[in-house]
From Swiss-Prot:
Pfam families: GidB (PF02527). S-adenosyl-L-methionine binds at G89, L94, V140, E141, R159. Keywords: Cytoplasm, Methyltransferase, rRNA processing, S-adenosyl-L-methionine, Transferase. It comes from Burkholderia lata (strain ATCC 17760 / DSM 23089 / LMG 22485 / NCIMB 9086 / R18194 / 383). Specifically methylates the N7 position of guanine in position 527 of 16S rRNA. GO terms for cellular component: cytosol. The gene is rsmG. Gene3D superfamilies: Vaccinia Virus protein VP39. This is Ribosomal RNA small subunit methyltransferase G.
Amino acid sequence: MTARRAPAVNRDGLEQMLVEGTTALDLALTDAQHNQLLDYVALLGKWNAVYNLTAIRDPKQMLIQHILDSLSIVSHLRGRASARVLDVGSGGGLPGIVLAIVEPDWQITLNDIVQKKSAFQTQMRAELKLANLSVVTGRVESLQPGVEVPEKFDMIVSRAFADLSDFVKLARHLVAPGGSIWAMKGVHPDDEIARLPEGSRVKQTIRLAVPMLDAERHLIEVAVDEAN
């Protein structure tokens, strides 16, 4: 299948935006990581029409609403020398591919139920040379440690997967001891938090500041009881 041509974009302009954004987020990235992130934006634009990855077509808005949005959670997830991370409902690879680029010591698994999107994720693994990235297709509630995935995860993240209570119900069996579920949300999800299932609780709520984005963003960390 042939990719349609993406909108023309000045890579230097995008690079300047990315540098400003990562500086605002206090993230020190290498030149190689900056280039990988810019390559990822270009590939999202190139293959979007084929894989139906995002409604956003403008590369600058892709950088802001996808890349910087995903980068805004990095400092809050850090604290482990290495970590096993599952990105549920990853779609075009967000935030998982961004995490794999900026945290090469983490093992990132992308999960989606749509085979076409998994195919794109696998292609990104090869094109961006992400040895720490793996892809698994299927419903998250059907994934079993030691079968579809090697083991349980320290962090399970989602950017646009489901209602928070549903996310916790479906993914909790994959949380490793001491691990957490992390949900990226827009406005503060009071109603969703009120419906959290028994044996789960909010550990912290973080208001995110995404550079160049005038919109509310929150990161919710949920702990689950190991017995559940």
